[in-house]
Each structure stands twice: as C-alpha cells, then as structure tokens.
Regions:
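Extracytosolic ligand-binding ectodomains
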Residues: 1-255
C-alpha cells in the first residue's frame, strides 16, 4: 500500500495508494520555496534506493525552478548508512540552512543525532518515509523537534474519520499509527469501492474480476485517511495532495 516507485505501476492492473516518488520531490521543493523555509538547501539521499534517488532527482529539478540554491547533493548507499559525518560536514561547509532528507526514518534518526553532535542546526525536511521516526528504538526524540515532512497522513487531524482510526489503532496496538498504517487501511476501502463500482460478484472468474476492477479504478473517488476525493489515472497513479506536518512537543502536528 505504501509503494511509491513508478516501477510498480508498469503492469496494467496495478494501482497505487501512495503518491509517487517524483510527486514527492516536486511537492517538497514547492512547499519549501513557497513557505520560505530555506534558501540554501543540501540533500542527503540513498543512491542505492530507487525510492530515495527518485525523489532526490525531481526535488533538485523543481528546487532550481523555484529559485532555491541546492548547495550540496550528498549520497550514501545501503552499505554506508551508519556514518553521515562527511555528508553533514559538506552541507554545513556549503552554508545549507535546510537539509532535505528523502530517506527512511532509521537513517534520518542517525543523521539528526550526528548533526546534533557536531553542532549543526539547519532545518530538516523529509518525506513520507520519515513518518515513524518518533518510534525509532534508542533515539532521542527531542532531536526531532521542528523536523518537517510531507506525508499523506497526519495522526493529529481533527476529522472524525482520523480520530476514530487513531483511537482504535492505539487501543489495539498501543501506538499512534503512521502513514504506512493509514495507506494500508485506505487500500482496503479503495478495493471495496472498486468492487462496488464494478458490480463484482463471488462467481466471477479471477480474469473477469481483474478486468472489472481495473476498469472501475478510473471511475471511483474515495475519501480516505490519506486524501479526500482520491482518484486514479489509467496509468495506476493516484491523485491526492500530501499533508505538511512538523514534529512539535514529541508528536506530529499539522503545519
């Protein structure tokens, strides 16, 4: 449900619940520029990850279009994701006042810890893969205060659907749900909407069912936890707007 690479929708019958990597990069650059969050930007990304490198590429392109100065593009790989001192030093030396992190929360927690250790205090801005950083084991979550990210889900939203989901999730699992949980929840109801739209019945063959659901996906609109009025293109890409959140007082808060 949280697959965001454009590679996953190369087949005709695959539809995403999560917005694509290119969209995340573009939207992040636009949000940073439009809200004057930084002027000199460094990017630390995982060049061995299609997810991370895909977001990085479109972010840099859109950042330049929006007049942001990208002063450092620092890569790491799956084999070198425990020491980010070199990347942070280059960002600091380049005068970056904002560091963009199109990565997952485990690596992000290490970067925040190491940046704090070297006295480097830029603004940090991430994407949906960082949703979950407050739950990283042995991480000093006070270091995440002020971290911003775009994600399809905000657990502190005050609409009834979100409040009910968060309450039930906490009761069952003892934790606050993140966007990965919300995407999975929405995916079930997207399938339900497609089944109803297609008029699918239990006696349909797997082939006929697949054809019917594929056709229905481009004509449904779903109000979910991760987006209102979500629709799908024939390519499989979902149309929905990300939400900007900031970590404040140890919790995610809408910006």
């Amino acid at each position: 449900p949280s697959a965001s690479s454009t590679d996953v929708i190369t087949n005709d019958n695959v539809f995403q619940a999560c917005f694509t990597d290119p969209n995340q990069g573009t939207a992040s650059a636009q949000y940073i520029a439009d809200n004057n969050l930084g002027t000199k930007v460094a990017v630390i990304y995982d060049s061995s990850s299609v997810y991370s490198s895909g977001i990085e590429a479109t972010f840099v392109e859109e950042a330049q279009n929006k007049g942001l100065e990208v002063v450092a593009e620092e890569a790491f790989t799956a084999d070198s994701k425990t020491d980010f001192s070199t990347q942070l030093q280059k960002a600091q030396s380049a005068g970056a006042d904002l560091v963009f992190l199109p990565i997952y929360y485990t690596e992000a927690s290490i970067i925040l810890t190491q940046a704090n250790g070297m006295g480097y205090e830029p603004a940090f801005f991430g994407v949906d893969g960082m949703d979950g950083i407050l739950g990283v084991e042995n991480f000093d979550t006070s270091l995440a205060e002020g971290v911003m990210l775009l994600t399809p889900f905000a657990a502190d939203a005050d609409d009834e659907k979100t409040k009910a989901f968060v309450s039930t999730f906490k009761e069952k699992y003892g934790d606050v749900p993140n966007q990965f949980a919300a995407d999975a929840y929405d995916a079930i109801y997207v399938i339900k909407a497609a089944i109803e739209q297609a008029g699918a019945t239990p006696d349909m063959s797997a082939s006929d069912l697949g054809t019917a659901l594929t056709g229905a996906m481009t004509s449904i609109s779903v109000d979910g936890l991760t987006g209102e009025g979500m629709t799908w293109q024939a390519t499989g890409e979902v149309s929905k707007a990300p939400k900007a959140v900031v970590i404040k007082d140890g919790a995610y808060a809408a910006m």
